[in-house]
Every structure is written in structure tokens, then in C-alpha cells.
């Protein structure tokens, strides 16, 4: 069984409903969890953080990111969401900045939590092994929730 399929089985075994998935991203893939399970997702991956405290302008969307070793997501930001991440398997690198200039990468380990503001530039990086990151999208515009197209790629290793 592939690492991706094994991860999906593990997530489902915790009682989560996977509503969509994409294992064909050049950097790895993701699982989208049913939004009605946001609090259960927080209980499992964010130490029970009350999801009501995360709401900025609308709903919350939980996801699992699966990052391949040595792969870099695009240097990017979003117009209609902030994000909160928690590394729950492996370690990963993250670069953050309030401008288009990339800062130095910092390494995050299992259990580390990261809060990204709307518009903050960021890049998630796989290191020596696969990394799993729990992510909650904090939609900032309740009338126009964020989606996979809400991404401004400042730099991308894959020419997207």
C-alpha cells in the first residue's frame, strides 16, 4: 500500500470522512475532511483547540497535507484565508515572510503548530522523509470562501 493510501486509511480509521483527495500534486497530496468534523479534527490534531476561536469570517476547512521528501510547495499566499498547521508525522521545513522575499527555512517537528495570517507568504518543504501536516483553512470572507484557486504563486518549482 502506498504512503498516500496508508495515510488515508489511518485518517478514516480515526472516524474522519474524506470528502475529496488529490495524490497527484508534484509535491505530494492532500485529503479534505468533512467540514462538519472540524471540532473532532481539532480535538485529534490541535489538542482540542475550540474551533469557534478560529473562525475569522466564515467556515473552517480541515485538511491533511502529505509532503514528499525533498519536495517544495510553491512560495505562495492567499487572499481569502488564513491557515493553522500542526505537524503530526515527521518533520518539515517552512519559510515565511510578510513580503515576496523568502526568509531562512525553519525546521518544525511533530507537535509543532504554525499560524499563518491571510496574505502571509509561506512555503512548506519536505525534508528527508514524508511529512504529514494537519491544516485548517480559516476562511476570511464568508460570502466567498477560499478554495484551491485562492493561491498566488510568487515562485513555483513546477512551473505552475
For every predicted segment, state its role:
Residues 1-60, 74, 106, 151-160:
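A short, N-terminal "cap"/entry segment at the start of jelly-roll beta-barrel domains
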Residues 60, 80, 118-120:
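Short, surface-exposed coil-to-beta transition loops
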Residues 62-66, 84, 105, 113-115:
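Conserved hydrophobic/aromatic beta-strand scaffold that supports enzyme active sites
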Residues 69, 79-99:
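Glycine- and acidic-residue-biased ligand/ion/polar-headgroup-sensing regions
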Residues 74-76, 85, 94-96, 115-116, ...:
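Short beta-strand His + acidic residue motifs that chelate non-heme Fe in jelly-roll/DSBH
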Residues 81, 93, 100-102, 131, ...:
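Short, surface-exposed beta-strand-loop junctions and turns on beta-sheet-rich folds
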Residues 98-119:
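Short acidic-glycine-tyrosine-enriched beta hairpin
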Residues 123-160:
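Double-stranded beta-helix
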Amino acid at each position: 500500500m502506498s504512503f498516500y493510501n496508508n495515510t488515508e486509511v489511518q485518517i478514516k480509521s480515526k472516524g474522519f470522512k474524506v470528502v475529496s483527495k488529490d495524490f497527484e500534486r508534484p509535491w505530494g497530496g492532500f485529503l479534505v475532511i468533512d467540514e462538519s468534523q472540524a471540532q473532532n479534527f481539532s480535538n485529534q490534531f490541535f489538542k482540542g483547540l475550540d474551533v469557534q476561536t478560529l473562525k475569522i469570517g466564515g467556515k473552517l476547512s480541515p485538511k491533511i497535507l502529505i509532503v514528499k521528501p525533498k519536495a517544495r510547495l510553491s512560495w505562495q499566499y492567499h487572499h481569502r484565508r488564513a491557515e493553522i498547521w500542526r505537524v503530526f508525522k515527521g518533520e518539515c521545513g517552512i519559510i515565511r515572510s510578510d513580503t515576496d522575499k523568502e526568509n531562512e527555512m525553519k525546521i518544525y517537528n511533530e507537535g509543532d503548530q504554525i499560524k499563518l495570517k491571510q496574505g502571509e507568504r509561506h512555503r512548506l518543504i519536505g525534508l528527508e522523509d514524508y511529512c504529514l501536516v494537519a491544516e485548517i483553512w480559516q476562511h476570511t470572507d464568508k460570502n466567498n470562501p477560499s478554495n484551491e484557486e485562492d493561491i498566488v504563486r510568487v515562485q513555483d518549482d513546477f512551473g505552475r
